[in-house]
Each structure stands twice: as C-alpha cells, then as structure tokens.
Amino acid sequence: MGGIKLFHASDLHFNAGYFEYILTLQDKFDIFCFSGDFLYKENAQEKEQVTLWLKSFKKPVFVCSGNHDMPPSWLNSIRGIYADDAIKTINGVKFGCVPYLCDDLLDFAECDILLTHVPPAKTNTSISKNDKDHGDIELARLIKNNLLKAKIILCGHIHEPKSHTDVLNGVKIYNSASNGSKEPFYQVIEL
C-alpha cells in the first residue's frame, strides 16, 4: 500500500451541509469511503438525493449500508460506486464493502480494507461515552483469531465513541461517525 489518500466519513444522516462540504474536498483525495447511514428517514426523496450526490464524485467511491439505509437495495442500484458486497482492488489494495447485518464476514477474508457500519466490539471505537458497547462481536472475534486479513476497518454507527481510532490485534480501526456538529467528522487515511 502506498501513495493513496482516503477520505472516510460515516453517519451523515441526510445532512445537506455535510454533503456540500464533502464535495468541496474532491480534489484533495484519491478515494472516498462512507460507512453507512446516509439517510435520516427512509424515503424516496432522500434516496434520490443521496444517489445523485454519490454519482457526482469524480473519484472512486466505496460505501456500505447502515441501519438507517435499510433495505439497502437502493445503494446497490447506484451505478459508478462500489456498494454492499463489492470487493475491488485499486493500486494493489483490496477493498471490501460489508453490508449491514452481513451473513458471512468471511466472504471478505482477503480484503485489506473493510468498510463496515458497526465497529468491532470491545474497542474504544465501539464503546460510547456512556460505556455501552454497541460493537460487532463476530467481527471482533474474526480479527482476534486472524481470520480476516484486513489491516484497516472503516466504520461508524457510534456517534460519540470513546475514541475515533483504535487497534485490535494489529488492525487499525477508524470510526468516522458524524455527531450532528456543523461540519461533518471525517478522517484522512494515507496508505
């Protein structure tokens, strides 16, 4: 991995200001990654506007569905982006887009970077500031047992985690969930 600059955000919840702000950053990044929860309410207007926004990127876009994006078939119907269940290699880096409530995480065992809505359990990225763990137990188990080759997990879901980054068994975890502030929270990952 080398020379790629990733943008990562999650939990934008149909905030038009966030969408506009992120579009102004297009020239600063090579790849854009979003870990779900594009919608605030599940309705046709929100889906249509998010679709147009995602199609407007001139760089590769990887997305996975979140709990607010259900059912996620609308994301998979967007041409020109990599959505749920996609596995794509760019410059030698294999990306995997894990659907919300994924049936088999081992389908993504060979990926270097996983986009998943929910962070691995028992990490500072999955534990909220009120000490509740909302993480994915199976994802954590697979990482701990070296059953996934991922070096990076891009996630969200927890809007105010104890930390936006953590490491589990050598795997770097980035929780980039926005929390409703004026500008979207995002992280820059250099590969």
Regions found by a protein language model. Give the residues of each.
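Conserved catalytic scaffold of divalent metal-dependent phosphoesterases
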Residues: 62, 67-142
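A structural preference for long, well-packed, hydrophobic secondary-structure segments
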Residues: 3-5, 13-21, 130-134, 146
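Core catalytic region of metal-dependent phosphoesterases/phosphodiesterases
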Residues: 9-90
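Glycine-rich phosphate-binding loop signature in dinucleotide/nucleotide-binding domains
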Residues: 25-28, 107-109, 147-148
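Binuclear metal-dependent phosphoesterase catalytic core
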Residues: 2-3, 88-92, 107, 140-146, ...
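Active-site neighborhood of phospho(di)ester-bond hydrolases with catalytic His/Asp-centered motifs
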Residues: 7-11, 32-37, 61-67, 82-84, ...
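Cap/insert and terminal regions of metallo-dependent hydrolase folds
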Residues: 39, 50, 123-161
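Short amphipathic alpha-helical segments and helix-helix/interface helices
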Residues: 19-23, 47-55, 105-106, 136-145, ...
